[in-house]
Structure formats: C-alpha cells, structure tokens
UniProtKB/Swiss-Prot annotation:
Function text: Functions in the biosynthesis of branched-chain amino acids. Catalyzes the dehydration of (2R,3R)-2,3-dihydroxy-3-methylpentanoate (2,3-dihydroxy-3-methylvalerate) into 2-oxo-3-methylpentanoate (2-oxo-3-methylvalerate) and of (2R)-2,3-dihydroxy-3-methylbutanoate (2,3-dihydroxyisovalerate) into 2-oxo-3-methylbutanoate (2-oxoisovalerate), the penultimate precursor to L-isoleucine and L-valine, respectively.
Cofactor(s) needed: [2Fe-2S] cluster; Mg(2+)
Protein name: Dihydroxy-acid dehydratase
Known pathway: Amino-acid biosynthesis; L-isoleucine biosynthesis; L-isoleucine from 2-oxobutanoate: step 3/4; Amino-acid biosynthesis; L-valine biosynthesis; L-valine from pyruvate: step 3/4
Residues bearing PTM N6-carboxylysine: K124
Reactions catalysed: (2R)-2,3-dihydroxy-3-methylbutanoate = 3-methyl-2-oxobutanoate + H2O; (2R,3R)-2,3-dihydroxy-3-methylpentanoate = (S)-3-methyl-2-oxopentanoate + H2O
EC top class named in words: lyase
C-alpha cells in the first residue's frame, strides 16, 4: 500500500522545519496525515474563459476540507488565443501549454501533493494540465469553467446567433456597415466562459469527459448556469474519495494512467471526429498520450476517422448550433451513447465518477435514463444576460432535444457523413501527415486542385488576401509557421476568416505547417509534417505548382515527380545556413524563451511536444 506522498514533508523529526512552514499556511497538528490535495487554478482577468474562476479554487478547497482532505491552491498562466491572434502574441500560445504542464508538475512534486484538482478552461490550459496529470500520475479530476453563452443580435430584421468568428469575418467584409460590425462585436461574446462554439477549448473540455477524467456535463454546462457549481463541489468531494482509494485501499485503478488507457484515447478520438472538434485536439491528444506513456499515433487517428461518422455540427461548422444546444441534446454522454449504440466505443474503460464508461452512459444518456434529475440537468439553458459572473442564472429549456434524425446530436443511422469530422491526409507534401476538419468543409470541395500561392509568414498571406491578390481556385500555402519555424506554430484564423470575407471561403484552399483555430472552417489543412523548417517537402513547393487535395482518399500532393523534388532538395541544401528558412528575413522578434522552445520542440505529427534529447546531444 503506497504512503501518502505528503508524508515526505509532514512526518519525521527531520521535517520539523517543513511542518513549521505548513503550520504557517494554516495547517494544524491534526491535519498532518490527511491527504494534501493540490488545486491548480488558472484564474486571470485577461481571458473571458477564466475571468470567473477567481473563487472557484476556494469553492473546491472548502468541499475538500469538509470531506477530510487538506486543499492547497495555486495558479497557472493562461493565454487567450483570440486576443493573441493575428500578431506576434500568437507565437506564445502553443509553447504556453508546455509551461503550464511544467508548472503543475513543479508545484505538485515540490510540495509532495497527494492528488490534484485541475480548474482550467481555455485552449492550452486544459491540455497543459492534462499533460501534467498524466506525467504526475496521482489521483486527478478536471473541472473546467464551462462554455460561454452564444451571442445574439438582430441583423436585417432577424435575430441570429453568433460568436467571435463572425466579428472577425464581418470586420474584413467591405459589404458590411460599420453599424452592423459594431452590433456583432458587442454581442458576439456576451458572458464569461470559453468561446461558445466547438472551438479548441470546448473540444478539449468535452474530450476530458471521454477520457474519463472529468464529470458528466463538464464540456457543455454553461459557465453562467447554477448547475456548474455542483460540478465544482462534486469534484472536491470525489477527489478526496479517489485519494483515499489509492493511498488507503491500494486501488491503482483511480490513477490517471489507469483511466486514460489506449482504449480511452480511442474513445476520445471517436468523440472528437463524431462532434467535428478542433484540429488542435490532434496535437493535444498526441502530447497527452505521450505523457501517459500510451502508444497512440496519427495512424490511430486516421483509422478512427475512417470508421466513426460525424454526428454533430456545431459552430463554426454550423450556424444553427452552439455548445448550449449540445447540452440541451444530452451533452457528451449522449454522443458517447450514440457511438456505443453503433458499437464504436470501448465500454469497459474506467472513469473518475463511474466504474466503467458503460455504467456512466446508462445513467447519464438522456435517451436511456429514467432519472428526472439527469434530464433536468441537461435542460439547463442560457440566461441571455451579459455577465462575467459564474452560476448567475438557473434558466431551463422546457424540453430536451432528443431528435436523433434532425436534432443537434444525430444517431449513427442519421449521421451527417459516414466518416468523421476530422481527417488525416498523406502525400508527397506531407509525408508524416496533415489534418483537415472535414466537418467544416463543403462536400463539393472534398476534391480540390489549384496553383500554390506561396507565403512565408501569416502576415504576408493576410496582406495578400486583403489586397485581393488571392483568386478563386488558388491554394494559399503558408510555411515556416510550424513548431520550429514560427516558432510556436501560430493559428491561422485570420487568413481563413478573411478568405470568407472576400467570398472565397468555398473557392480556395489553405495549406500550412502552422495550425488553425478551433474557430476555423473551410478547406483549411494544417499541421503539414515535416514542417518546412525541418526540411519538409512543403518547403520545396514553388509559386504556381499544382496542389491536389483528395479528402475521400486521404491524399494531398504537389504535382511533382520524385526526381523533381530531389533536384529541388539538392538546390535547397546547397544554400547552406540559408536553407530551410524564409527567402526574405521576417521582422518578427523571437525572444530567448521562444528560441528555447524551438530548440526542443518536435513535429506536429508527434504533438509538437518538447524533446530535450535534441539539446542534450
């Protein structure tokens, strides 16, 4: 039976100094021997998805102490990708994920924490904390801040739902009036919470349910709704139970690596493609699996994406639905239930709240359960009042959306497409693969060919699009924006949004070794690996080369022979130190912190995780 980790600093004569310091934090003699639970919060006033988390750590801490534990809260950084978007601030977003993972590891190991509650919400914070949880492998529960309510405004005499992507697209559309743009801007993000569509933050918070490390409703219960308080409280109660099961009952089944097995990662990816999640989830799942020491690769993702249908289309893949609508339709447990009915789910994996995923679905799937409390829970509705306060309203829909043919969540029989909402493409331009969110692509352009328009920075591409240099039929190719080349693998939400602004959203493709925001839709193909800065063939493409994209057959290629590519490679290598770099110097400032990330990071095909062996040797 394992000792409590905290015993290292709370027991023994030689720890008198440490105990003296523990006492200075408020601990008493009778507290030594209780499980010390770390509460990793991520409150910040910079990020709407985190602005309401200030008191959440102490809410959880109070419940932990009532349940017999000792809670110690600390904070991590949190970058808002939307605010950092479109300028050099985006260079810091992906690297922040690894810093967050490190900070949680540092705090928990330095202070010998016995268990962990992760309070996260937005794009890099949830995956960063997940990486830390797998790395630490101590009992852990995730409880996130919850999604924002969708924006609503009246345009042209009609009320419409909207989000921040609508504001970006309209701002660059010369046909939109200043008045309409202002109406959308002030209405797009009405409350605290993670942006209201199936963007990266909400995708990851939903995947936490599928991985089994968060409670039902975590991914879809609105940040403003009173029901969300119960998730925080239950997380506090349950983490003490998990800690005691492990340290006092020797139950290793409650540990993150026992829960997040390869079968659980398969479930998470099945959910991801079924709900048309953000392409960033691919990066993060690969990184989290690596920390969990699970062999889960792009090949596994490709296999799952071919077998699992797309059951959900939420903004940005649809104008009809946002996260509040997914919740009304039964949330993630309903989607997992539909996958289970289609025999597309591993039912026997463990969770932090139920013995198996099958047991959880039987209780929480609104189409199976007779529990009125569960059905009431999923009728939680938006309050439609501008606020930054959590738990500020308790509105309910009169009915649930259980229409499996035309509702927000469809059955396998009524799927939008037979294959999932994410796809991995391979070819001579992406030997290690690249990612496209098919749920956001019009099926008419699943096959697309066009001349490459080469840009060696996001800024250059944006200028060309806004300057009307990009024409219908073009393939906008943005390179040297990968994990090493950026560095930091910028998101390309502005280029994709501006293509829509110019009426080219369905008439052009965009290919990059960078990545895309969860708010991106259209024929946007990212994570092209190997990246240009690592000698990938994307660095050999020249202006006007024909790019061929074939989503049904999962291929992407430049129309060059192997011999032609070899000749170009030889010419590139001959440039010496100038090889595999932008032809023209870029003005961006790359700090020492970013250079350190670039020196250690790996390909997007491996999650853009750091590999210290690259600098050790």
């Amino acid at each position: 039976m394992p000792d409590y980790r905290s015993k290292t600093s709370t027991h023994g004569r030689n720890m008198a100094g440490a105990r003296a310091l523990w006492r200075a934090t408020g601990m008493k003699t009778e507290d030594f021997g209780k499980p010390i639970i770390a509460v990793a919060n991520s409150f910040t006033q910079f990020v709407p998805g985190h602005v309401h988390l200030k008191d959440m750590g102490q809410l959880v801490a109070g419940v932990i102490e009532e349940a017999g534990g000792i809670a110690k809260e600390f904070n991590t950084i949190a970058v808002d990708d939307g605010i950092a978007m479109g300028h050099d601030g985006m260079l810091y977003s992906l690297p922040s994920r690894d810093l967050i993972a490190d900070s949680v590891e540092y705090m928990c190991n330095a202070h010998c924490a016995d268990a962990l509650v992760c309070i996260s919400n937005c794009d890099k914070i949830t995956p960063g904390m997940m990486m830390a949880a797998m790395r630490l492998n101590i009992p852990t529960i995730f409880v996130t801040g919850g999604p924002m309510e969708s924006g609503k405004t009246v345009l042209g005499g009609m009320e419409i739902k909207l989000d921040l992507v609508d504001a970006m697209v309209m701002a660059a559309d010369d046909h939109c009036s200043d008045s309409d743009i202002n109406d959308v801007e002030v209405s797009a993000c009405p409350t605290c919470g993670s942006c209201s569509g199936m963007f990266t933050a909400n995708s990851m918070n939903c995947l936490a349910e599928a991985l089994g490390i968060a409670l039902p409703g975590n991914g879809t219960t609105l940040a403003t709704h009173a029901d969300r308080r119960h998730l925080f409280e239950e997380a506090g109660r349950r983490i003490v139970e998990l800690a005691k099961l492990y340290y006092e009952k020797d139950d290793e089944g409650v540990l993150p690596r026992s829960i997040a097995t390869v079968e659980a990662f398969e479930n998470a990816m099945a959910l991801d493609v079924a709900m048309g999640g953000s392409t960033n989830t691919v990066l993060h799942l690969l990184a989290i699996a690596r920390e969990a020491e699970v062999n889960f690769t792009m090949a596994d993702m490709d296999r799952i994406s071919r077998n699992v249908p797309c059951l959900v289309k939420v903004a940005p893949n649809s104008k009809d639905y946002h996260m509040e609508d997914v919740h009304r339709a039964g949330g993630i447990m309903r989607i997992l239930g539909e996958l289970d009915r289609g025999e597309l789910l591993n039912r026997d994996v463990k969770t932090v709240h139920a013995s198996t995923m099958a047991a959880a679905i039987d209780l929480w799937d609104i189409t199976r359960t007779d529990d009125e409390a569960v059905k009431t829970f999923y009728r939680a509705a938006p309050g439609n009042v501008r606020t930054t306060e959590a738990f500020s309203q308790n509105k309910r829909w009169k009915t649930l959306d259980d229409d499996d043919a035309n509702g927000c969540i469809r059955s396998v029989e009524h799927a939008y497409t037979k294959e999932g909402g994410l796809a991995v493409l391979y070819g001579n331009i992406a030997l290690d693969g690249c990612i496209v969110k098919t749920a956001g692509v019009d099926e008419e352009i699943f096959k697309f060919s066009g001349p490459a328009r080469i840009y060696e920075s996001q800024d250059a591409a944006v200028a060309a699009i806004l300057g009307d240099e990009v024409k219908s039929g073009d393939v906008v190719l943005i390179r040297y924006e990968g994990p090493k080349g950026g560095p930091g693998m910028q998101e390309m939400l502005y280029p994709t949004s501006y293509l829509k602004s110019k009426g080219l959203g369905k008439e052009c493709a965009l290919l990059t070794d960078g990545r895309f925001s969860g708010g991106t839709s259209g024929l946007s193909i990212g994570h092209c690996s190997p990246e240009a800065a690592e000698g990938g063939n994307i660095g050999l493409v020249e202006e006007g080369d024909l790019i061929k994209i074939d989503i049904p057959n999962r291929t992407i290629s430049v129309d060059l022979t192997d011999e032609e590519l070899a000749e170009r490679r030889q010419a590139m290598v001959a440039k010496g130190k100038a090889a595999w770099k932008p032809a023209e110097p870029r003005t961006r400032k790359v700090s020492a912190a970013l250079r350190a990330y670039a020196a250690m990071t790996t390909s997007a095909a491996f999650g853009a995780v750091r590999n210290v062996e690259q600098i050790e040797h």
